[in-house]
């Protein structure tokens, strides 16, 4: 750490710069929820709101908060804009902190994503996971911190869990337990 440069956290700075709004007065979450067709709107509102609060709590607190859920959009077929909708949850100024694609739950790169990104959008991969990778993914979603060595660093260090997970999948048959 440098004594000459202050530590910056662009995600926290973004959230801190937002105006405070009364949710009951503005209804932004409700309007967003209405852009997705679901079988049970009440559960959708409850689970999405909890997940979204978890996203902000994760971003604003290094300890004590981990978003232990993965928001998953399902649909009967491709081309229903599931991944697009999820990607657009990330505000434009924070697009550099959004990862969309396939991950290796047992690889080292995912640790960097968890520590440095706001969102990890697992795109059309949930059905492909074997039991070992499925368990590894569950562990990654719920871990409070990750340990790894950054490129050119000498030592392994611990970093708080920043990222919140989301995913899209075709069909509903992806949970095995």
Segments and roles (model prediction):
Residues 3-119:
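P-loop NTPase catalytic core of nucleic-acid-dependent motor ATPases
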Residues 63-64, 158, 175-177:
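Short, conserved, surface-exposed binding loops centered on an aromatic residue
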Residues 100-104, 146-151, 168:
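Short gly/ser/thr-rich secondary-structure transition/capping motifs
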Residues 110-115, 150-168:
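AAA+/SF3 P-loop NTPase mechanochemical coupling elements
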Residues 118-141, 174-177:
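Conserved AAA+/SF3 P-loop NTPase catalytic/coupling segment centered on the Walker-B
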Residues 134-157:
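Conserved catalytic/switch belt of AAA+ P-loop NTPases
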Residues 169-173:
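Short, polar loop motifs at secondary-structure junctions
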């Amino acid at each position: 750490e440098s004594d000459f440069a202050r530590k910056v956290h662009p995600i926290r700075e973004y959230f801190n710069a937002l105006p405070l709004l009364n949710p009951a007065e503005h209804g932004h979450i409700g309007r967003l929820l209405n852009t997705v067709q679901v079988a049970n709107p009440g559960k959708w509102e409850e689970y999405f709101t909890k997940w979204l609060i978890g996203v902000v709590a994760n971003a604003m607190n290094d300890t004590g908060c981990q978003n232990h859920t993965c928001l998953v959009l399902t649909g009967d077929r491709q081309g229903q804009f599931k991944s697009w909708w999820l990607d657009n949850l990330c505000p434009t100024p924070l697009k550099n902190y959004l990862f969309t694609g396939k991950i290796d739950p047992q690889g080292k790169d995912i640790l960097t994503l968890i520590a440095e990104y706001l969102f990890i959008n697992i795109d059309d991969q949930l059905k492909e996971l074997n039991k070992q990778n499925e368990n590894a993914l569950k562990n990654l979603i719920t871990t409070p911190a990750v340990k790894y060595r950054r490129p050119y660093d000498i030592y392994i260090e611990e970093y708080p869990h920043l990222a919140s997970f989301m995913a899209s999948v075709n069909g509903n048959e992806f949970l095995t337990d």
